[in-house]
Amino acid sequence: MEKLNTHQIEELLFFEKNSDEQIIKPMIDMLEQQISYMIPEMRYKLALKDHNRLSQIAHSLKSSALQLGLKKVADICLTLETEGRRNTEFAFEPLIFDLQIELRESITELSIYLKKTKQIAS
């Protein structure tokens, strides 16, 4: 499975190119800030068995991931969101761990993709 939705990223690049504002970097920075508190918050809500709140956090993170074209991250978040809404016993912790790793890998891959795209455009 592809980590990135390159079509979404290309749309962001197009929008950024046609405006005087930097768009993608602030979005990545914001996502990294979200990660710093959302992942621990997910674990905390899991410990409290507050699956509904865990689902809400996953939904919010999924939205940010989709905006940046982080397809695999969004898929993991969707699973967490769906299972959290079901409020059943589910192996949340391994998936939260996978999410944390996938976020780092996908952000790195996005950065590489952006550098390659800018080199081609030059």
Whereabouts are the PLM-identified features?
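Two-component system phosphorelay core
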Residues: 1-56, 60-62, 66-122
